[in-house]
Amino acid sequence: GIVGVNREFTAELAAAVKPIFLEIIMAPKFSEGALEVLCTKKNLRLLEVDMSADKKSHNQYVSVNGGLLVQQLDTTTVALSEDMCVTEKKPSAEQMIDMQFAWRIVKHVKSNAIVVVKDGKTLGVGAGQMNRVGSAAIALKQAEETLAAEGKDIRKEGLVMGSDGFFPFGDSVESAAQFGIAAIVQPGGSVRDEESITAANAHGIPMLFTGMRHFKH
């Protein structure tokens, strides 16, 4: 596997990942203690990455037949607020924190993207499916299996779902409700948004519309 962090890789972190089979670890810096631990692992590559703001690229390059597509990277996002709530039920303070986390994570997942989170942890990821309900099914199933391994029932955990694009129909909300999802954040903007809002209201699920999508192809 591959691990990447955005801060110094410490000896404590090195000890935590040592039992795991990894091929690459990326970090801005590795401490001396971390190097002592990690250099004992065979076939492990350590990459120091310059994460300075002035070193970051602002463009994305994709090869196409007969040419090259250059587009701006999606580097912006929005801070969530209760004013974005489109449902009768409003999210709790704890749910707002998890919704902001889900919105931040789903931005980096290949579209169509769905994430399921709780208490600042990603429990399920659905990526790259042809339709959004398919990605939702994958993310929900992953979350269910992750929690089941801990002896927990997904329907009792009050999880939060995030989507990088709008729900074209109400089916994704219905699927979320079947798994006990307690709050949803999505861009909104579908001509059938009302179907998703109606489904969320029927199940007592607070839902935010951010007004901004995060497609990653």
Regions found by a protein language model. Name each.
Residues 1-217:
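ATP-dependent carboxylate/acyl-activation modules
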